[in-house]
Regions:
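Flexible, low-complexity charged segments
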Residues: 1-135
Length: 135
């Protein structure tokens, strides 16, 4: 009888451990927002007056491996974004719709860079945490 009770107790104590292992195996990959730090700062537009921008950018990736690859290629990503921002005109940044188009174009370019380097885009979305324009 004592043996049966001990066996049942041992089985009961091991169930939470088995449930935890199943949860880890079936868990969805973690979504990570990787902030490009420091913020992107530069000038844009043409004309006699310099116009400046400051953009705090976050990249959404799924999984730690994807984030590690994005971090590895961050200098290339930053360069691509700086070049994109420097090509903008005052008109292309004047409205919220224009800023959304810029965000979408930035996402496309980041995905293209990562596709060229890693064989797949890795970044699912690009977000402007803050976009400041001074003209």
């Amino acid at each position: 009888m004592k043996t049966v009770v001990a066996l049942l107790l041992a089985c009961a104590l091991s169930l939470p451990v088995l449930a935890e292992e199943e949860k880890k195996e079936g868990a969805a990959p973690q979504v990570i927002y990787h902030n490009l730090v420091p913020a992107l700062v530069g000038n844009y537009g043409v004309g006699p007056r310099l116009k400046f921008y400051k953009a705090d950018v976050a990249l959404r990736v799924t999984g730690v491996d994807a984030e590690a690859k994005v971090i590895h290629h961050e200098p290339l990503i930053r360069n691509q974004l700086v070049m994109l921002f420097s090509q903008q005109t005052e008109e292309s940044l004047a409205s919220p719709d224009a800023k959304e188009l810029l965000r979408q174009e930035a996402l496309k370019q980041v995905q293209q860079v990562l596709s060229d380097e890693e064989g797949r885009p890795l970044v699912e979305d690009l977000l402007f945490n803050n976009l400041i324009l001074q003209g």
